[in-house]
């Protein structure tokens, strides 16, 4: 008993440091899970959640029988796959380039510059995109396209351009966070590997492909698995605010998160919104478990669990 008490006293500061994080997870992640019950009920506001009649799987049937089910699932999945791949490739490339900078002050400036967009709100990003793509005063229509002898484009009325626009906007905003993690991993690589490679006459490209990338594999796999865990979740602001909620663009910008919001705000259908959220969570859970199982089969040490 004395040993246990001593251990509690010894680790008490660490337990207290954990407490805010645990409370945050409990309040924001676990307590909302009780709302899953709404997906199986026909909510009646006068009766409340518990007294409302059960609907079984009717909300899910309505969701999957609607024409939007396939569109929002396809958009959510394909966009997130593109985001993961593009951000990973660009993040690794920028991290390698920054690590090649010898001047420490310049290296810090570049690191700060690449992280700055990540700290911006999506509202600011939406107005930056609007300043570029506005039909009347946008930089692209008024400056860039005339130089290329191309007629102005009504960007907010042309769905075909928006997959590329959203991928570029997401990469510009989000690549900095992953880039810093890759930089931290690159700093941890033993410099003697590179010295030995140079003595053997290796080129810079060979150093990257034979030393840098293999040493980054554990970090890449960890970030990849964490990203896959949220592959069915989208940045609401990116798909709602950046396209300015343009109805013409819904076929290419409507994802599960925006669909849930519109179903809740415009239709007032909380039960169907909850069903879409449950569907989103279950598919994401299955995908991350499957991905972790595959990694575990290949290399146990690199799996999350």
Task: Identify the role of each PLM range.
Residues 1-2:
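N-terminal Lys/Arg-rich, disordered targeting/topogenic segments
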């Amino acid at each position: 008993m004395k040993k246990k008490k001593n251990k509690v006293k010894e680790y008490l500061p660490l337990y207290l440091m954990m407490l805010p994080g645990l409370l945050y997870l409990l309040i924001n992640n676990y307590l909302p899970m009780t709302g899953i019950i709404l997906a199986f009920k026909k909510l009646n506001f006068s009766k409340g959640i518990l007294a409302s009649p059960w609907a079984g799987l009717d909300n899910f049937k309505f969701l999957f029988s609607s024409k939007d089910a396939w569109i929002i699932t396809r958009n959510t999945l394909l966009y997130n796959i593109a985001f993961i791949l593009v951000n990973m490739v660009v993040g690794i490339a920028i991290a390698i380039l920054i690590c090649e900078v010898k001047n420490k002050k310049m290296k810090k400036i570049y690191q700060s510059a690449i992280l700055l967009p990540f700290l911006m709100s999506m509202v600011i990003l939406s107005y930056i995109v609007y300043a570029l793509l506005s039909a009347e005063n946008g930089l692209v229509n008024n400056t860039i396209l005339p130089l290329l002898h191309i007629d102005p484009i009504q960007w907010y009325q042309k769905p075909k351009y928006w997959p590329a626009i959203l991928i570029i906007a997401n990469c510009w905003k989000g690549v900095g966070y992953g880039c810093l993690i890759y930089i931290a991993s690159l700093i941890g690589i033993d410099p003697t590997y590179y010295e030995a490679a140079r003595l053997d006459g290796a080129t810079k490209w060979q150093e990257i492909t034979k030393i840098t990338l293999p040493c980054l594999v554990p970090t890449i796999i960890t970030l990849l698995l964490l990203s896959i865990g949220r592959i069915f979740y989208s940045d609401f602001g990116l798909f709602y605010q950046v396209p300015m909620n343009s109805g013409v663009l819904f076929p290419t910008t409507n994802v599960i998160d925006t669909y849930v919001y519109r179903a809740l705000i415009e239709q007032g259908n909380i039960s169907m919104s909850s069903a879409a959220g449950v569907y989103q969570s279950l598919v994401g859970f299955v995908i991350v478990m499957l991905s972790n199982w595959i990694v575990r089969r290949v290399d146990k040490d690199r799996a999350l669990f």
